Curated annotation (Swiss-Prot):
Family stated for the protein in its record: Belongs to the tetrahydrofolate dehydrogenase/cyclohydrolase family.
Pathway recorded for this protein: One-carbon metabolism; tetrahydrofolate interconversion
Originating organism: Acidithiobacillus ferrooxidans (strain ATCC 23270 / DSM 14882 / CIP 104768 / NCIMB 8455)
Subunit structure of this chain's protein: Homodimer.
The UniProt record lists the keyword NADP: yes
Biological processes per GO annotation: L-histidine biosynthetic process; methionine biosynthetic process; purine nucleotide biosynthetic process; tetrahydrofolate interconversion
CDD domains, per database record: NAD_bind_m-THF_DH_Cyclohyd (cd01080)
Protein task: Catalyzes the oxidation of 5,10-methylenetetrahydrofolate to 5,10-methenyltetrahydrofolate and then the hydrolysis of 5,10-methenyltetrahydrofolate to 10-formyltetrahydrofolate.
Protein name: Bifunctional protein FolD
The keyword NADP belongs to this UniProt entry's keyword annotation: yes
């Protein structure tokens, strides 16, 4: 068996086309474009690249982007004050603070300072809580993007054994809530999990989000499983790889996402979707 590759780039382009139509309709109706503010603290090269890509993608779908590049020695009070200004700026519908932040920041404090209706990353405790209560509003971008990948690929997960490797607040935990909402039976594996291989081996749907290159051996994968690899790990030789041994897993799985080109494009597409939803809601549409 050779797995079918799930093309995240192609599915993301389909979403971009829909966003473009809706954002231009928004402009015609309200006289302005939906607006996304991206805040970067420091000069981390990878973060700068991500921010630039987000700006370019915003421009391609008719979303206005506002960038603030703050120096690395910005203190928490200064960043909180800037977020406060964005919270009341009527041109801004969504706010994203690029992570990771420098070590002198408490990320949770910063995330909680963002107005819940502008939390387009979907990280605010209010939005995570709504998802837990089966009434999601603005959803965490990577988990929601994965759900779209599955839906667009015609993969039904209701009743399936789903295993998530990684329990972060950004991916693992909200991913578990998304899968529960969709009717899967969910196991979350973490650093204290015993016999990871056994858990992976029973997964009909595997979501790997540990941030450790090659953590999951292809030999562990259940025959016919769906493998979603969230990991984006840069190796010393410059190559980018996921958390799963792709070559081995591809011979056992039915479906698999490549790295890069699988989950990553969907995360950005969902961010833009959230920005549009937030904009429409702020102008009275019954999305959230």
């Amino acid at each position: 068996m050779t797995a079918r590759r799930i093309d995240g780039k192609a599915i993301a382009q389909k979403i971009h086309a829909d966003i473009s139509l809706r954002s231009h309709a928004f402009l015609r109706q309200w006289g302005r474009s939906p607006g996304l503010a991206v805040v970067l603290v420091g000069a981390d090269p990878a973060s700068r690249i991500y921010v630039q890509k987000k700006r370019e993608t915003c421009a391609s779908v008719g979303i206005a982007s506002f960038s603030a590049n703050l120096p690395a020695d910005t203190n928490p009070q200064q960043l909180l004050a800037h977020i406060g200004e964005l919270n009341v700026n009527d041109a801004v519908d969504g706010i994203l603070v690029q992570l990771p932040l420098p070590p002198h920041f408490d990320p949770e404090e910063i995330i909680e300072a963002i107005a819940v209706e502008k939390d387009v990353d979907g990280f605010h405790p209010y939005n995570i809580g709504r998802l837990a209560l089966r009434a999601p509003l603005l959803r965490s971008c990577t988990p929601a993007g994965i759900m779209t990948l599955l839906q667009e690929s015609g993969i039904d997960i209701k009743g399936k054994e789903a295993v998530i490797v990684g329990a972060s607040n950004i991916v693992g935990r909200p991913m578990a809530l998304e899968l529960l909402l969709a009717g899967a039976t969910v196991t979350v594996c973490h650093r204290f999990t015993r016999d990871l291989a056994a858990h992976v081996g029973r997964a009909e749907l595997l979501v790997a989000a540990a941030g450790k290159p090659g953590l999951i051996s292809g030999a562990w994968i259940r025959e016919g499983a769906v493998v979603i690899d969230v990991g984006i790990n840069r190796l010393p030789d410059g190559r980018v790889t996921g958390d799963v041994d792709f070559a081995g897993a591809e011979q056992r799985a039915a479906w698999i996402t490549p790295v890069p080109g699988g989950v990553g494009p969907m995360t950005v597409a969902t961010l833009l979707q959230n920005t549009l939803i937030a904009a429409e809601h702020r102008m009275g549409a019954p999305h959230v």
